[in-house]
């Protein structure tokens, strides 16, 4: 079976591509070619935003799955519908678990939890994209499956709550140097983390699955930890003591516009969230 991955080299998608290939999928990556292609992977070097160029590149192709990992807005998916209508048996869109209702009315999150996020434009854009896709499914049979990842990490992107311009590894460097690291709130809220290899198992299971068409799924592990536990685990792995500085999430959101902490904290990581699938 053939799959076209739009993107395919990011934190989440790299392990999905590897597992799909391992299970016998013929994989093509459509991206701008800035990273080396894994062995055995086909490549279409193009900018997905150049609709005419992409249409020419796939003119003679048909895919069992189109996997969209870099779609963010309603306009992005409208373009994809034009490109891939009648070109694929399944279109899988990566949304976000941050789209679920905020503030939370129940810490237990399922796929039927309403999609409302007044704090983060990123999440609202994902919600609008989902609405466009589900409308296309209902009106024209566009074969969409929606996947909502939660906080996903891997060996190159360790899980932290907030960081500055130097990224996630800045936090690990501060721990190694004995410097304080910020933990939002009192660090007691529960959080679900998922390794990208675990995410890949769930994702590949949805590929070419006819029961997944027209449905949304979040893919997470069933283990939850407090932010204090998460940071302590990182410090223990580094062999260093944790020098935690607890700062109220509302204060961080108010005074840290440069880093968009309002969106990431109030719109996602401030509250306890336990993802559970039906």
Predicted stretch roles:
Residues 3-23:
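N-terminal Rossmann NAD(P)H-binding glycine-rich loop of SDR-like oxidoreductase domains
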Residues 37-50, 70-72:
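Rossmann-fold cofactor-recognition segment
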Residues 61-108, 117, 124-135:
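NAD(P)-cofactor binding segment of oxidoreductase domains
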Residues 107-111, 115-131, 151, 161-169, ...:
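Short-chain dehydrogenase/reductase
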Residues 131-160:
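Conserved beta-loop-beta element that borders a ligand/cofactor-binding pocket
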Residues 163-171, 184-207, 214-215:
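Substrate-positioning beta->alpha
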Residues 205-267:
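Mid/C-terminal beta-alpha module of Rossmann-like enzyme folds, strongest
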Residues 272-278:
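Conserved small/polar residues in nucleotide/adenosyl-binding loops
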């Amino acid at each position: 079976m053939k799959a076209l991955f739009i993107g395919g080299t990011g934190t989440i998608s790299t392990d999905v591509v590897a597992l799909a290939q391992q299970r016998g999928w013929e994989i093509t990556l459509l991206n701008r070619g800035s990273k080396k292609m894994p062995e055995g992977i086909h490549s279409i070097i193009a900018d997905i935003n150049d609709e005419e160029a992409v249409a020419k590149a796939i003119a003679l192709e048909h895919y069992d799955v189109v996997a969209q990992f870099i779609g963010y807005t309603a306009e992005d998916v409208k373009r994809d519908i034009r490109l891939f209508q009648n070109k694929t048996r399944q279109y899988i869109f990566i949304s976000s678990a941050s789209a679920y209702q905020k503030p939370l009315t129940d810490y237990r999150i399922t796929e039927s939890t309403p999609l409302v996020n007044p704090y983060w434009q990123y999440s609202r854009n994902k919600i609008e994209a989902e609405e466009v896709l589900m409308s296309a499914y209902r009106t024209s049979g566009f074969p969409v499956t929606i996947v909502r990842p939660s906080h996903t990490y891997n060996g190159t992107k360790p899980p932290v709550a907030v960081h500055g311009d130097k990224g996630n590894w800045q936090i690990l460097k501060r721990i190694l140097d004995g410097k304080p690291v910020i933990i939002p709130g009192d660090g007691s809220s529960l959080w679900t983390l998922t390794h990208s290899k675990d995410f890949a198992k769930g994702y590949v299971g949805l590929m070419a699955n006819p029961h997944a068409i027209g449905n949304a799924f979040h893919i997470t592990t069933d283990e939850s930890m407090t932010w204090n536990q998460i940071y302590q685990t990182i410090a223990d792995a580094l062999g260093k003591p944790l020098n935690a500085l607890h700062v109220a999430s509302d204060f961080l959101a108010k005074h840290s516009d440069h880093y968009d902490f309002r969106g990431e904290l109030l719109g996602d990581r401030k509250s306890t969230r336990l993802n559970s699938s039906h």
